[in-house]
Amino acid sequence: MAAIHKIGRRKCAVARVYVSEGTGVITVNKKAFATYFPTATLQYKVLQPMSMTENVTNYDVKVNVYGGGSTGQAEAVRMALARVMCEVGEGNRAILKPEGLLTRDPRMVERKKFGQKKARKRFQFSKR
């Protein structure tokens, strides 16, 4: 099997994932998976598509991810891995689709407006 390449996005983060048959080694930006995503929550998010389709130890994953913060990057990797799992197995799409792992989350940061402190917050109003 040749390496499968997919892209996932979330907020400003973009993840490029290369998956090939192997023993379950995951590297993110040339670092170990547990080093790059130290918290259990982020690790769970990244591994979710592979664990749901029971493919954690069947494939080696190489990830290039940039932009955004740690949560956005983890969810971008999750999106890309879910797309790869759909291509690898026929029945995987039926498993991942109801969980919402194949749907791009459209929520982005709302821009700051002039005449206001932040996107929604106004400057203090003085009646007199």
Swiss-Prot record:
Protein's UniProt keywords contain GTP-binding: no
Coiled coil: none
Signal sequence, start to end: none
Source superkingdom: Bacteria
Matching Gene3D superfamilies: 3.30.230.10
Record-linked InterPro entries: Ribosomal_Su5_D2-typ_SF, Ribosomal_uS9, Ribosomal_uS9_bac/plastid, Ribsml_uS5_D2-typ_fold_subgr
Residues that span the membrane, as ranges: none
Sorted UniProt keywords: Ribonucleoprotein, Ribosomal protein
Similarity comment text for this entry: Belongs to the universal ribosomal protein uS9 family.
Official protein name in the record: Small ribosomal subunit protein uS9
Organism of derivation: Flavobacterium psychrophilum (strain ATCC 49511 / DSM 21280 / CIP 103535 / JIP02/86)
Gene giving rise to this polypeptide: rpsI
